[in-house]
């Protein structure tokens, strides 16, 4: 139940932020999805350390399941990132599509690491 409720909250947050970014950014780069995924990676890195979560127990408690799997799972979007890249490729912007995918993965890894390091420093 908590995962479903959290997923709804996260999805609404993704929609809201994507809409706001879309009102101000009109370029070809899918900035909304990029910012959503990077911020989600930062938050999950931070909270996983704060909650003391490892890979095997991240689905365990209601708090972990509701926040990490539910909210952040609904908020971030791997499938939209892939669709954005396909759309760019179909528009003849294959180079931008590759840049977007590489930048998303590397920035996401860095953001998750940074979130985890910040949580370690505070704890």
From Swiss-Prot:
GO MF terms held by the record: fluoride channel activity; metal ion binding
InterPro entries linked to this entry: FluC (IPR003691)
Bilayer topology: Multi-pass membrane protein
Alphabetized UniProt keyword annotations: Cell inner membrane, Cell membrane, Ion channel, Ion transport, Membrane, Metal-binding, Sodium, Transmembrane, Transmembrane helix, Transport
Subcellular localization(s) per the UniProt record: Cell inner membrane
Gene Ontology CC annotations of this record: plasma membrane
Binding site for Na(+): 73, 76
Transmembrane segments: 33-53, 59-79, 98-118
Keyword Ribonucleoprotein: no
GO BP, sorted A to Z: cellular detoxification of fluoride
Coiled coil, from the record: none
Regulation: Na(+) is not transported, but it plays an essential structural role and its presence is essential for fluoride channel function.
Reaction(s) catalysed by this chain's protein: fluoride(in) = fluoride(out)
Pfam families given in the database record: CRCB
Keyword Ion transport: yes
Function: Fluoride-specific ion channel. Important for reducing fluoride concentration in the cell, thus reducing its toxicity.
Family to which the UniProt record says this protein belongs: Belongs to the fluoride channel Fluc/FEX (TC 1.A.43) family.
Protein name: Fluoride-specific ion channel FluC 1
Species, as recorded: Brucella melitensis biotype 1 (strain ATCC 23456 / CCUG 17765 / NCTC 10094 / 16M)
Originating gene: fluC1
């Amino acid at each position: 139940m908590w995962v479903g409720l959290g997923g709804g909250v996260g999805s609404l947050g993704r929609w809201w932020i994507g809409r706001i970014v879309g009102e101000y950014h009109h370029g070809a780069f899918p900035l909304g999805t990029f910012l959503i995924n990077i911020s989600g990676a930062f938050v999950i890195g931070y909270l996983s350390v704060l909650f003391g979560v490892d890979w095997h127990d991240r689905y365990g408690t209601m708090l972990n399941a509701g926040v990490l799997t539910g909210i952040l799972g609904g908020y971030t979007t791997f499938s939209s990132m892939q669709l954005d890249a396909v759309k760019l490729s179909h528009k003849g912007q294959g180079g931008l599509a590759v840049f977007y995918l590489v930048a998303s993965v590397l920035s996401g890894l860095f953001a998750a690491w940074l979130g985890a390091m910040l949580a370690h420093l505070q704890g």
